[in-house]
Amino acid sequence: MEWKIERASVEGQRLAADIRLQAIVDGEAALPGSLRDAATVLGVQARAVPGAGETQGDKVVLSGQVLFDVLYAQGDLTRVQCIETACDFRQIADAPGVTPRMALAWDVCVEDAQARASGGRLMLTAALSLYAIVTADAAIEAVTDVTGDPALRTRCCRARLQRTTGRGEARALVREEFELPAALGVQDTLYATADARVDEVVGGEGRVTVSGTVELTVCHAGGESRPLVITRHSAPFEQSVALEAGEEDAVGASVRVLDVMADSMEAGEDARVLRTEVELLVRAQATHAAQRELLCDVYTTSGDLAEPARREERLMADGAGERARESGKIVLALPDDAPPVGTMLAAFVQPAAGTRERSGGRLRVDGMMGVTLVYLPIDSQVPVSTRQDAPMSVQFACGLSADAAIALECVEAVASAITSDRVEVRFILSLEGMDCGAQPLQVVTDVTRTPAQAEPGAIVVYYPAQDETAWDIAKRYRVDAQSLRALNPQLEEARAGEPVVVLRRGAAEA
């Protein structure tokens, strides 16, 4: 009998590379004060801004900037000053099989930042964690079924395939003003940081509207009793993005803070106004998910042998980005040589992710947390700082797997003195991650017929190996699965070491 092989073109996205990198960025900046005045670094915050990403022949090139905000005191040690500077980075990662114009998604975060003053200059260092996922559109000719002979036995499986059908991005500028009460004692605004999140994505017909919230943390210079003042503010944003999406496509969006500017000025008697400007990059993406019925395996119970030809493909199944937040707290004991706490001014937290484990619908992230405390000692108007590393373990409510690429940031940290040598730090961490969602799929590309050698009939007692299934046993001895279960009524699924009785073709039933 002639076999009829049914084929179909399967459209999906192939995972070309999943890259994880660590990098160190060094830089320096000149202090504006006199060389004769020693400078004391009180704290440093750094954030990484992704720039251009490019796929080339067997490699991926990632570039961007690290923005440093350094608090220091120089000359008048009771006065907190700030210097802002940027350092460029460029990383090249080997990626065999990658070609130009493949789709690239990547992100970067700062895991540690340090600053040291020497000879009128600041020496800056940042440790970066980068990840990149490269995909390519793939159209695969796959066998979906084989018919035409009653001796054929086929097993099909459902494959979930996901592919990106559209991308779009736009820049947004969020300007907002806030009142600063006179009770805060703000004299000047030093710098600001911002975190943005997406709250809603709506729209259609070629455009989507992305709305969300920008949260700002602003550092100000104050008076002698409180030389450093921290204020927090929030503002909404809304941005339209051009995006072509189908009716059955899922639409998602993400937002990245590119730049933050803040300044304050007097506005009448005992009043001050804070003016902020935040530049955002808003990205939208449409994805289409589909279930396809594909041939997984085939054999015959008589006649010619059926030999499936297979090819392994890593196709995207559930790849998606996700964002989550979680709060926590730690209690720190000051170092023995640190002066006792009088007035707590600020806390800066820099998380670094280590091991990850998924349990109970949550992703637990263990790692280290660099904590910088800025405070006024008892009976002193000169601010000091201490930096300590503390272990952390935070559980995020999200659907990311333990192998997902993640980036951690601290969006808020508040410190309060329990005693003169113990401080409680409450923090909120933001996790942004991406599951590549690739599944190794054995695609049957063809089925060939080969003559079968004559074999005598027999009754066989077979002991399955580990991970061997009833289908594997039936295929090995070219018997029907129903006859296998008829001889083994208790057989739900094969178990290693438990005997299975097989009536081989040609044996007569007693």
Each model region followed by its residue ranges:
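Membrane-lipid interaction segments
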Residues: 2-456
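Primarily a LysM-type cell-wall glycan-binding module
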Residues: 449-486, 491-510
